UniProtKB/Swiss-Prot annotation:
CDD domains: ATP-synt_Fo_b. F(1)F(0) ATP synthase produces ATP from ADP in the presence of a proton or sodium gradient. F-type ATPases consist of two structural domains, F(1) containing the extramembraneous catalytic core and F(0) containing the membrane proton channel, linked together by a central stalk and a peripheral stalk. During catalysis, ATP synthesis in the catalytic domain of F(1) is coupled via a rotary mechanism of the central stalk subunits to proton translocation. This is ATP synthase subunit b 2. F-type ATPases have 2 components, F(1) - the catalytic core - and F(0) - the membrane proton channel. F(1) has five subunits: alpha(3), beta(3), gamma(1), delta(1), epsilon(1). F(0) has three main subunits: a(1), b(2) and c(10-14). The alpha and beta chains form an alternating ring which encloses part of the gamma chain. F(1) is attached to F(0) by a central stalk formed by the gamma and epsilon chains, while a peripheral stalk is formed by the delta and b chains. GO terms for molecular function: proton-transporting ATP synthase activity, rotational mechanism; proton-transporting ATPase activity, rotational mechanism. The lineage of its organism: Bacteria, Pseudomonadati, Pseudomonadota, Alphaproteobacteria, Hyphomicrobiales. Coiled coil: none annotated. The keyword Ligase does not apply. Belongs to the ATPase B chain family. Pfam families: ATP-synt_B. It is a single-pass membrane protein. The chain crosses the membrane at residues 37-57. Its main location: membrane. It is found in: Cell inner membrane.
Amino acid sequence: MAEGHGDANGATAHTAADGGHKAPFPPFQKDTFASQLVSLLIAFVALYLIVSKIALPRVGSVLDERAKRIEDDFAAAQRLKGESDDALKAYETELAQARARAQAIGAETRERLNAASEAERKSLEEKLAVKLAEAEKTIAATRETAMSNVRGIAADAAAAIVQQLSGLVPDGKALDRAVDATLKGSQA
């Protein structure tokens, strides 16, 4: 061990231990191991008690609270997912019903328009048939009138031709028969 020597001022000088070596680092001194181990054991027991009685319950309660919050959030998410699935099913059902209604309305409108256009077409066909019959009657009457005028014109022309060529006035009855025969042949 080191010995101290006092000087005139009362200061103590430290000298090297026997053998001229310095004193070893105190934790590594063999004669203090037992007290150091007891101090270390007391420190670890105190640390263990503090950690196990104060810190670990707080950490455990925080972890339990966090796990409970996660469980609650997961349950809420599952509930909301179920609600959204139900809402989606209801939406899809409503959408399918709306499509069916739209198709039914479209089909009904199409049928109604087809029926209206068919009725209009039939009405127009009937009106056209009536107008066609009237036109045919008018044409027949006009033709009859024209043919009666043609007969007179043809008889006058034939009489003029016969008189011009032969210089004789033709007999009216013979001329009428010849014109009638010629007109009947052209109509056939």
